[in-house]
Design a protein with these regions (language model features):
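Histidine-bearing beta->alpha loop at or near hydrolase active sites
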Residues: 71-72
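N-terminal secretory targeting modules
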Residues: 1-40, 46, 51-52, 56-60, ...
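Oxyanion-hole/transition-state-stabilizing segment in secreted/luminal serine hydrolases
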Residues: 47-55, 59-65, 75-99
């Protein structure tokens, strides 16, 4: 584990273990992402977005990734942009974020 990264993340997310765990998992999963796909990112509305229904309704030739974290605030999302958005290099982004 990258201790420096964890400490910065812990500070940015105010020690919220659930949010820290999700972002750490995203960081790992990003190693397997195919660039140029679709990304949903933001707070709980994105985390809980019915992506499977979206896929069923539209025959999309792209993969959809979800980087939603319930309870994310704007400042927390901004602090995690590298792992929740930039690392995926998406072609299309849907973002919804709280306060």
């Amino acid at each position: 584990m990258d201790i420096e990264f964890y400490n910065k993340l812990n500070q940015a997310l105010h020690g919220d273990a659930g949010k820290i765990d999700r972002v750490m998992r995203f960081r790992y999963l990003n190693e397997f992402v195919k660039p140029g796909q679709i990304l949903f990112a933001g707070s709980s509305l994105m985390e809980q977005f019915p992506i499977q229904e979206f896929i069923a309704d539209f025959d999309l030739p792209l993969t959809i990734y979800n980087r939603g974290v319930g309870g994310f605030t704007t400042s927390e999302m901004l602090a995690c942009m590298q792992d929740c958005v930039y690392a995926l290099r998406p072609a299309y982004i849907f973002i919804n974020i709280g306060t």
